[in-house]
C-alpha cells in the first residue's frame, strides 16, 4: 500500500485491524537487520510511506522543521540548509533512508556525541495507532509537560506500537567552522581516554568521534581503491575526530590542544 496522507494510513490500519491482517511499515529499505522483512505465516500488508514525502513547514526562527515520514533524510538536511539551519542527523544511507525509519529505529548517526540520537532531535510526532486512531502530537515546544509523552514510546519501536506519519524535528544553528583530525591510538582503551580528554578540553565542540580498526580500512582500500588513504599502511587502531565551533573559535587550534 502507498498512502499519500495520514488519513489514508488511518483508513488502511483500521481495515487491517478489523480483518486481523498484520502490517509491516516500510521506509527507505536501508536497514540491514531484517526489520522490514515479514515473518513466516499469513502475509501482512506492506505499508510504504514513500508517497508521504513533503516537508510541511520550516520555522527557522524556532529552529523547527515539520516533515512527513517518507521524506528522505538528505532532503530534510537540504530543507534546513536552505534556511541556514542544520539538521544534524547524518549517516551513510542518508540519500535513501527516510525520516520515519530514522525515528522508528532511533538512529544515531555520526554526530550523536553533540546532538544526540534521533529521539533527541524530535519535538513531536503525528502517528496512527493500531486501532486506526490518529495521534496529533506535532508539538514545536522545547518545554512541554502536558500529559503523557507518547513520542518516546513510538520512537525506537520499529512500527510495533504505531506508524509514524510526520514529525516536528529540532534544528540547530549551522557551525561556522568544522575541523577534523585523524589520530593513531594503541587500543580502544586509549581511544576512550582520548575521548575523555577531548570532551574535558573542548566540551560541546566535539561533534564526532569514530574508532576504526585496520580491518575496516583494508576493506575500504580493497573495494574503493580510488579513495586516498592517509597512511601507507593502516595502523591497528585509528580515531577520526570532528569538532565544530562558532566563528570566533579556531577549530585547528582547538584540535592541536589534544596532541
Residues of each region from the PLM?
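Noncatalytic alpha-helical scaffold of FAD-dependent oxidoreductases
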Residues: 1-259
Amino acid at each position: 500500500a502507498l498512502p499519500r496522507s495520514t488519513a489514508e494510513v488511518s483508513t488502511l490500519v483500521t481495515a487491517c485491524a478489523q480483518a486481523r491482517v498484520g502490517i509491516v511499515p516500510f521506509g527507505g529499505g536501508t536497514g540491514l537487520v531484517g526489520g522490514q522483512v515479514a515473518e513466516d505465516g499469513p502475509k501482512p500488508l506492506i505499508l510504504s510511506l514513500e508517497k508521504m514525502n513533503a516537508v510541511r513547514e520550516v520555522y527557522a526562527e524556532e529552529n523547527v522543521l515539520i516533515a512527513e515520514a517518507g521524506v528522505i533524510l538528505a532532503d530534510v538536511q537540504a530543507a534546513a540548509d536552505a534556511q541556514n539551519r542544520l539538521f544534524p542527523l547524518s549517516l551513510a544511507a542518508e540519500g535513501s533512508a527516510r525520516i520515519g525509519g530514522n525515528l522508528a529505529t532511533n538512529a544515531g548517526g555520526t554526530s550523536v556525541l553533540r546532538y544526540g540520537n534521533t529521539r533527541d532531535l524530535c519535538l513531536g510526532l503525528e502517528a496512527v495507532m493500531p486501532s486506526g486512531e490518529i495521534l496529533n502530537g506535532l508539538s514545536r515546544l522545547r518545554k512541554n509537560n502536558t500529559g503523557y509523552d507518547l513520542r518516546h514510546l513510538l520512537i525506537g519501536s520499529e512500527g510495533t506500537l504505531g506508524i509514524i506519519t510526520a514529525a516536528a524535528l529540532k534544528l540547530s544553528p549551522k557551525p561556522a567552522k568544522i575541523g577534523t583530525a585523524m589520530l593513531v591510538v594503541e587500543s580502544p582503551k586509549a581511544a576512550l581516554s582520548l575521548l575523555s580528554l577531548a570532551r574535558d578540553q573542548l566540551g560541546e565542540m566535539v561533534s564526532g568521534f569514530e574508532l576504526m580498526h585496520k580491518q575496516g580500512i583494508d576493506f575500504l582500500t580493497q573495494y574503493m581503491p580510488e579513495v586516498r588513504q592517509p597512511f601507507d599502511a593502516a595502523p591497528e587502531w585509528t580515531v577520526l575526530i570532528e569538532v565544530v565551533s562558532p566563528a570566533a573559535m579556531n577549530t585547528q587550534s582547538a584540535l592541536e590542544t589534544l596532541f
